[in-house]
């Protein structure tokens, strides 16, 4: 009898860990970033502006980036880093190539665990969402005019939301421009 009681606390810990992870996988999160040249490090002047919306759960994140007044976009990344520093790329969202043609100001897609690189390579979605909730990630948009970045914005979490009961489960469009 003592043997079974001794295992009870251990089994409770295991059950709590499983419940916590599955609760995270079902939690809806929403984050936003306002993109401008003034957020670049160092700051640059650009008339271009943009927004990045990220929404999803512990399994995947959908993103949509809208840009106006921008020239030829050559790349878009999510970086790990504070607002005042340049950090490592953790997710590549876009790289220009001849077959895709130019980006017209709207970029949308999905981030999964296989998207991670740099400090997040081999890690899970929770690692990225933890960084986002700590305001330690930013979106950076590169152009031919500003190869080190024309638009940048810290990704700020909007909290946990209830799962949308609609047919798209709250996901954003995945059409690229």
Regions found by a protein language model. Give the residues of each.
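Bacterial N-terminal signal peptides
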Residues: 9-18
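Short, intrinsically disordered, low-complexity terminal segments
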Residues: 3, 14, 22-24
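Metal-centered catalytic cores of metalloenzymes
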Residues: 21-76, 80-177
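Bacterial N-terminal signal peptides that target proteins for export
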Residues: 1-10
